[in-house]
Each structure stands twice: as structure tokens, then as C-alpha cells.
Amino acid sequence: MSLAQEINRVVAPFEVISEFKPAGDQPAAIAELTERIKNGEKDVVLLGATGTGKSATTAWLIEQVQRPTLVMVQNKTLAAQLANEFRELLPNNAVEYFVSYYDYYQPEAYVAQTDTFIEKDSSVNEEVERLRHSATNALLTRRDVIVVATVSCIYGLGTPEEYIAGMVTLRKGAEMNRDDLLRKFVSMQYARNDMDFHRGTFRVRGDTVEIIPMYEELAIRIEFFGDEIENIHTLHPLTGEVIRDEEEMYVFPASHYVAGPERMSRAIKRIEDELAERLQVLESQNKLVEAQRLRMRTTYDLEMMQQMGFCNGIENYSSHIDGRARGTAPHCLLDYFPDDFLLVIDESHVTVPQIGAMYEGDMSRKRNLVDFGFRLPSAMDNRPLKWDEFQERVGQTVYLSATPGKYELGKSDGFVQQIIRPTGLIDPEVVVKPTKGQIDDLLGEIKTRTAKNERVLVTTLTKRMAEDLTDYLLGHGVKVEYLHSDVDTLRRVELLRELRMGVFDVLVGINLLREGLDLPEVSLVSILDADKEGFLRSSTSLIQTIGRAARNVSGQVHMYADRITDSMAHAIDETNRRRAIQVAYNTEHGIDPQPLRKKIADITDQLAKEDADTRELLAASGKTRGKGKGASTVRADGLAAAPAEDLVGLIEQLTEQMHAAAGELQFELAARLRDEVGELKKELRQMQAAGHA
């Protein structure tokens, strides 16, 4: 992107730092992927069996090709997990997280059958919004960037050109009028607030200006001497302690949707022209109610834009503000990447169809809004990318999946295989059994497994059958739980943890194939009605379900069926193919499969331990836990010089925030706060040991 060239991008190498080295199939997969990417192949598929370390292979691939990378995943939870893995593997590089910043989102819609208009309603997660800004900031200021994103990255975002044009460059010794800088900050949608200093605001104290950019947790202090910038510092917003001195810094706008006065006035003129044209069409069709409704709503929005520079739902006028022709694609995160970026699509069998489906789902809702006079036709240009537009914007692509779809297999010239697990574990043995007497057979298998302290997953086709089976097993003394759609997210995490710990032995569910579900204690997966063709018994679903038993040395899968369907045959053949390769490799290299030792802990455990430790430490400091003051999240960096009282207060505040984040299921934020609390407590203990607290 040409405008980004005026920013001095930091160029640092991608470097994987890990105690582990590539093992099993990983070295060969990394070498082949690297060769094919460097040879210019546009589409490459990595067929990686469950548990073979596809994420680590991706990190080593990025290290080899040294290119900015976008990793697309199917949902926010997996995006957070993957971002954390990459941060551990590439600690010196920028690993960013870009997902929808809505905790709750109800788009505006009109239901013609009942004449019901539903207003837009949403709640924005400020921490996720910061991470989105952090991603675009990183992409424009450095090359060593990995962005882990959901399909949110193909939805409209302000133009990178306007984002850069709205940026201000601060350089030590440069001439700059203080008042001009304040006006510039306001035009960038930062608010002056001398009392409540938080992200997205600035404050002024004489010749000193301080600002917290939208994408930062630390503040920037600019000290003037007349019309010259005398000093620039990065400082802690809570304690005011200077972290480091700076020579040059960029401050980007507080919103991705920035438009200068000239661009806004041109947009208003274009909106007025479209309104007049659309009213003519509606009136000619005798749609007088719709015409009046459109006139009132659009005129109100125009008045807001003229007076305030923005209006609610301004994104519906994005094509006019961007100056785009009707029907052309919106700008999105992909436009912030340099031309040579690499795209990695994780779990491509799910994510690729998801990308293609976004446009039609959005259009069906907006057509009603336009037809009934709630929006101008140009509102339909505020949309996700179409599939062909997405393809035009991406270059070389790596598809990752244990079960690649027909699309990606058709695009690539053969696939790269990653079948061998570093632990030597092999794919489970698949046994097909008749449906007659299946429940009694299942009960016998459960007793065999539980006697060896192993766990069992059972997957059924219907909610009714799952409930009846759970009741039947309970009646026969089996410790069993039922996982269904009514169980909330936090309880699901707890159920899986309790299964691993042995609180119960059997988990019954309808769709237990969830990609990324790690349960090493599970040695048997039983699939009831395996011969009933459909989504839950497709070859892809069956292979994913079989993978849930691949974490155990003695893993087995029992399919109960009276005939072998095409889906079953494909799933069994593929599993046996992988199993044969794995057994041959282990025999040749003298490898004895090792059980996967995955720590039984989740964020709820860690928070409880952290809380007990905090109470003990604060008691030793002569303090008691009080209510936190809800201060905005801050980093623990550079607090060595802070008094003990400040540290105690900060620990209390961050602990409150940690529990609030966990309660709202924001586990990534809770984990980060837990780590910051740990660092602060380490410093407080050192002060206590030295007799300063």
C-alpha cells in the first residue's frame, strides 16, 4: 500500500523461540510448505491429523518465509487460543487479535409480515476494540506482524489512506504549535478530559500534553518549549512513572472511520443526490409511506453529519464517505496488509464456507430495509466482501485442516501431509458394531474403560436420545453427564474439566466433534446411529469425531451401524491410512507412543488460586481486600519504583477486574490480568523481603 511507505516501518525478523524442535512429520511438512510458497504456488493444503501440531508448523513456516501473515479461524474462542499460542512461540514479534468488538449485536432489521422495525442495538467490548486498533497500528508500522482474525476481517473498515492521513507524527525537536496539536487530536476523534484520563482521551497541563492512543495501554507525554517539542515520554497512566524516552512516535486516529471536512461535505452532497433520486423512484411507484419514512430518517442523519461530523449508523453511508462507486467492495482489514502477505486459513473445511456465506446473509436483511424506505440503496455497499472480492485481495494461501474440503483440495496441486504426531500417538482403531443390543454393548464397554480409569464420549443424533441414554446409564450406576446446547459456555468448560478429573466417567452429547477439543483421558468414542447419513454423520464430521480418541495410547472408536455408508467408508479408510503410516514410522524409528500429559486446569482454576494467594499476600502487608475502583486496565511494566501502598491498591483493582472479566467469559483478558497481578505480587514480595513494605 503506497501511503504506508511514508511511515518508517520497523523491519525485524520472525523468530520462533521454543524449547521444542520440529518432530514427527513437522520437519518434512515445514520444508515442503516453505518450498512451495517460495516457488510461488498460490494455494497449498496442509492435511494435518488431529494433534500433530499444525499451529507450531505454521509458526515455523512463517519464520522460514518471513512475511506478514493473516491467520483466519472460525470463531473468537479459537482465535484467542491460537493468538496465545503464537505469542508464546514468537514472543518478539507482533501477534495481534482481530475479531468483532461486539459483546452483543442486534442489527437493524424490518420484518414485513408483521410490520416490525427492529432498531440496531449493540454493546462494544472496549478491550477488543483496543486490540483491533493495535492490529491496524502494527500492520502500518512494522513488517513482523501476525494477525489472528475471524471473518470480521472481511467486513467494512475505514480506508487505510484516510487512517494514515489522519495520523500525527511526533518528533523530538520538531516545530509544532501546541494548540494546533490539540485541534488535530480532536479531529482524530480523541476527547479532551483533564479529570478522567483513559484510553481515547488527552489532557493538557500548561506546556505538557498527555494522550492515551486507542491501541495502547501506556500514555504518551509531549513536553513543549514554545513551539518546539522538547521531550516525548511513554509513561504509566496510573502512577505517572516514565517508562522510556522517545525520539519519534506516531499517533493514529481514535476511530477507523475518519473523514476530513472536505471529504464529509462531498459525502453529504452525494447522499442528498441519492436521496432525491430514490424519493423519485418510490413516489413513482406510489410508495408514499416509504418515501416519507426515508426522507425523515436520511434528513435527520444529514443534519447530524453537518453539525457533529457523524451520526448513528454512519457506516450505512460508507460508500459516499469513501468516495466509492456504487456496488464496489468496501475497504477492510486486508487492505492494511502489504501486498506480499501470506494467508493461513485454519480448519478450512469450516472457515472457507463461512467466508462465502457472509455476503448473502447480510444482503437478505438489507434488501428489506431498502425496499421499505428505512435505508438508501447505498447502505447495501456497507457489507462484507463477496467470495470473488476476497480472492482478489489475497495472494498465497495455506489451508490447514484434518479434513480439507473439496474447494481447497481442488485449488491445490496435491497436499502436504502431517500425519505423524511428535508424541508417537497413533490414530484410534475403528470398530463397526451392529445396532442390535448397542446400548448393552456400550454399557459393557463403559465398565471396561472406567475400571482402567479411562473416560468415554458418546455421540447421539437427537437431544431426546441423548437424554434417554443419560437416564439409562445413571440407572445402571454409571457416572455420566449430558452436554447440550442449553449448557452455558462457562459450564461447558467445567464439564470437560470434570470429565478429565474423573468427577464423572462418561459424557453424552449430540455434536462432540468440536475442533480443538483436547481430552487425553478419553480412550473410547462411541458413535450411535453411525449409518444415518446427514451433517452429523458426514465423512468430515466422522473424521473429526474419531480425532477425539487420538489423544490416548489405547484410543478406540466404536461405530454402531447396520450398514457401511459412503461417509463411514471414507472416514474409516482415511483413519486406517493415517494409522498405517504412523505405525510404520514408529516401528522404523523405535518410537513407543507416549500418553499426552495435558495439565488439567482452566482459567477458573487459575483465578481461584490467584485469589487465595492475593488474600494471603495483602494480609501480610496489613491490608484487607476491598472493592476495586474499576480503574481501566493497566500494565505492570516499570512499577519497580512505586510505593508499596500503590502496589497493594493496584493488585486489588486488577484482581477485581480479573474476576469481572471471567464472569463475562472474557477469558483472554482475565488471563492477561492474572499475569499482571502475578508480576505485581512478585514485586511486593521483594519489597516485603527487603523490609520496605
Swiss-Prot record:
Gene3D superfamilies in UniProt: P-loop containing nucleotide triphosphate hydrolases (3.40.50.300), UVR domain (4.10.860.10)
Motif (Beta-hairpin): 101-124
GO BP of this protein: nucleotide-excision repair; SOS response
A Pfam family this chain is assigned to: Helicase_C
Residue ranges of domain Helicase C-terminal in the record: 438-604
Positions contributing to ATP binding: G48, A49, T50, G51, T52, G53, K54, S55
Domain Helicase ATP-binding, residue spans: 35-188
Keyword DNA damage among UniProt keywords: yes
Predominant place of localization: cytoplasm
Domain UVR: 648-683
Record text on subunit structure and interactions: Forms a heterotetramer with UvrA during the search for lesions. Interacts with UvrC in an incision complex.
Family the UniProt entry places it in: Belongs to the UvrB family.
Recorded domain comment: The beta-hairpin motif is involved in DNA binding.
Protein name: UvrABC system protein B
Organism annotation: Arthrobacter sp. (strain FB24)
